[in-house]
Amino acid sequence: MENTRVFVSGLPPTFTNDQLRMHFSSRFQITDAHVLPKRRIGFVGFKSSEAAQQAASYFNKTYVKMSKISVEIAKPIDSEPVKKAEKHRKGSTSNDSTAGKALKRKRDGDNTQKDPQLQEYLSVIERPSKTKTWANGDDFLNTIQNQPATSELREEQRDDTSEKVEEHSHKQRKKPRVDDVPKAAHDREPEPMVLDKTEEEHERANADGQVEAIPPTQEEAEPVSDADWLRSKTSRLLGLLDEDEQAEFDSTAQRKPDPSSEPETVSKAGAQHSDDDKAAVESSVEEEEVDTNIEHIRLSSRLFVRNLPYDASESDLEPVFSKFGKIEEIHVAFDTRSTTSKGFAYVQYIEPDAAVQAYKELDGKHFQGRLMHILPATAKKTYKIDEHELSKLPLKKQKQIKRKLEASSSTFSWNSLYMNTDAVMSSVAERLGVSKADLLDPTSADAAVKQAHAETHVIQETKAYFTANGVNLDAFKQRERGNTAILVKNFSYGVKVDDLRKLFEPYGQITRLLMPPSGTIAIVEFARPDEAQKAFKGLAYRKVGDSILFLEKAPANLFDATTAPQTSVLETKAVSQGFSTADTFAAEDGDEPVVTSTLFVKNLNFSTTNERFTEVFKPLDGFVSARIKTKPDPKRPGKTLSMGFGFVDFRTKAQAQAALAAMDGYKLDQHELVVRASNKAMDAAEERRREDTAKKIAARRTKIIIKNLPFQATKKDVRSLFGAYGQLRSVRVPKKFDRSARGFGFADFVSAREAENAMDALKNTHLLGRRLVLEFANEEAVDPEQEIEQIEKKVGEQLDRVKLQKLTGTGRKKFTVGAQEDEEA
């Protein structure tokens, strides 16, 4: 997908979003503007990639408030430089957090409350008024007697002489000094004194990050001997035990681990793996979110698309999302009070895989200058029919309910200009001033032909009215349907425009309401697609007057862009569809599209595309095609460059001359066009050959094949129906062996113009309830050389059959099965 955003750097420090929007919208139409003031950068979105390229080249290295800005096309989020910058930013952040956590752990390690010697010292110097006089002073020594000694202390003990030990012991007994405790503590790292086994287990649980508490156990304090008390006051083991007791004490110390080292080990391991665990957790959470979104999308096949431009419509979103699969519905949310888009939409796919693929490919991508954010949407609410309750209703009522519920999704098989037969005959009878009984004489054999003529007259009048009001009749040939206009059909004759307006206005704002003077069909256009959808669901198959209302979605691009909407019915005269001999010959003398006139257009902008070039010349009368001359781009293989000129083809020379006068000097993409007549060198013989070929083709288009012909129709009915539009050479209706019609026929006119008039007039007409399907029949070859080739081919096939017959035998021979076996026996 092409990028539609530009990156702006070097902005003034106090630049705002509104100022950035005003600066770029002075020359281009923008959809988004965002400024990061601390970094002095910003992003601007445009409707198309061409506009973004032009803005980048125009505003690059310009000045804004004495600041030189740099403008370039923004890089996608998934590009390689952006990924590297993101990775570097995450790495620096994790390093900072690791350093901070290390310092925090180091500070947390200085926990003075776990030092028993310091606690004992604080208890000694505490005021007597704050101490508990009834408490035992040697409570700190209850569990110290089981504390093991380290190997270093045992070796030092063996090296000391008994005299030093006795002397040291004598001094300690004589005068125990509290000040010696911190001095001895400098020889080794302070070890926390465990007051109870329960507290030891609790400290281990806290170090492992567990929350489960262990219930404390109460044990009675045992009396402490003098040797144990002295051992607790010294940092070195004194030789107060016998050799056997010392060996037993050493083995106990080796078996029992040091609990103080376990929290430190756990903290170091946690410090090493904290960042890796955090990154792994973040990545796993993102993967889980993506997997969850995909699961939800597979269930609903529906996407929620946000951060869209406020002027985006369903037609803009459809080419973007239809690449991944068939779309059932696109709904853009509108504010009912302000009649503006809310900036988000829902896309409903038919297949879940298509929705998942669109989610993966388009999430975070550019669309008209904005980054789309796609999320899974809940399934659309559907109103299902209760089959049990429906079965209790009459069969006719069941069909009506089902048909109304399926109206919005079903397609119709009849033609778009279908009209109620009764309404057509009522309209014609009123104009002629006669009753329908007189118009349709039951004793007449050609009542069906009269009805077909009346319908044809009304259809031609309706076409003339729609053309005068900006309706593109060629749009009825296409299958693509729009989402704002509705064709209203099959209502009774006598329904007025005001009646239809009152019927449709409660569903939304009507921008256009067209009803021909015949009053047999109407076109209603709404301002928003959701309003048209509501009206379609609410009014489909509703009874209006004496008939049921038929609604059909109008074709896409039904109205010309140059025609302003009209909500009133114009009073137009009924146009007669009869063709006189003078009209026929006048038409024959008119300009035929035999030679196509071409205009040469130069001084084009090199950025102008073929679509833009065609869009400018297409509204002109007689336009056929437009193209810009290009050449291969040597720097970009596979791409093309504009050569700055092009050609425009028209049907006739007069139309080309009128276009030259209108478009010469026209300004297109800041370039003034120079339009001249194209002088293509052509051989006189080649030009004469083209004219002869065109005349031959025009002469051949005189025979019409009539398909879907009713089986009750006769040759007389076909001649009566088609004879009103020209002189017929012959009429043929093929029949079966039982003399019944085969469902098609042929009508051969004298001139091609008469055949075309009959084709245009009767291609939407119904005969005995069947719509006639008309096509030009393929004539037999007129060129003598082609006739000779066909004869030679036929003779060759006959010769091949004769040769094959000679090889296989000319006749049947009689032979006896098993005769040879009897002879051998």
From Swiss-Prot:
Region (Disordered): 80-289
Superkingdom, natural source: Eukaryota
Domain (RRM): residue spans on this chain: 4-76, 301-379, 484-556, 597-680, 702-779
Keywords: Nucleus, Repeat, Ribonucleoprotein, RNA-binding, rRNA processing
A Gene Ontology cellular-component term: small-subunit processome
GO molecular function: mRNA binding; rRNA primary transcript binding
Biased composition range(s): Basic and acidic residues: 152-169, 177-206
Family: Belongs to the RRM MRD1 family.
Protein's name in the database: Multiple RNA-binding domain-containing protein 1
Organism whose genome encodes this protein: Aspergillus fumigatus (strain ATCC MYA-4609 / CBS 101355 / FGSC A1100 / Af293)
Gene: mrd1
